[in-house]
Amino acid sequence: LPSVNSLADKRLAAALDMALLNQAIAGETFHAAMLDGALGFTPDLITVAYGTNDWSCKPRDMLVRDAEECLDGVRRLWPQVPLVVIGPLWRGDQDQFPERFPFADLQPLLASAAERHDARFVRGDELFPAVPELMQDAFLHPNDLGQALYGERLAAALKR
């Protein structure tokens, strides 16, 4: 989710009646070394929502490798916990970097990785509209209204 204690976090936690631990902050990318099996509890649900930051700094093959390693690590630590991989939200600058692989390719890449790891996939681009006014910076980070919308839509998707 966008940030710790964001409106999206709060909406999601309330809708699912769960405590929420968010490790997707500060430009984080798929990074298996950050997984910590010594949390002191077993999660009821794990969501993985990386990809947009990876796209901005990694070639396709590195992104796929890192996603696979991260999901391998999640499955090794918590093999029985339901796992949901969430594709990236719309970003307003996705067409401004022709040297990168197409941003739209992320959804199917991550869907395939999710399938290989017995995880459900939720398309992030279907949870958040391409509306710059819902972003605090007009292209990447949802504002309060955008976070509220994302939290509600993600909660509904996870309940299905």
Model regions: which residues?
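Serine-esterase "nucleophile elbow" of acetyl-processing enzymes
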Residues: 1-29, 33-38, 42
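Alpha-helical cap/lid subdomain in secreted, periplasmic
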Residues: 33-160
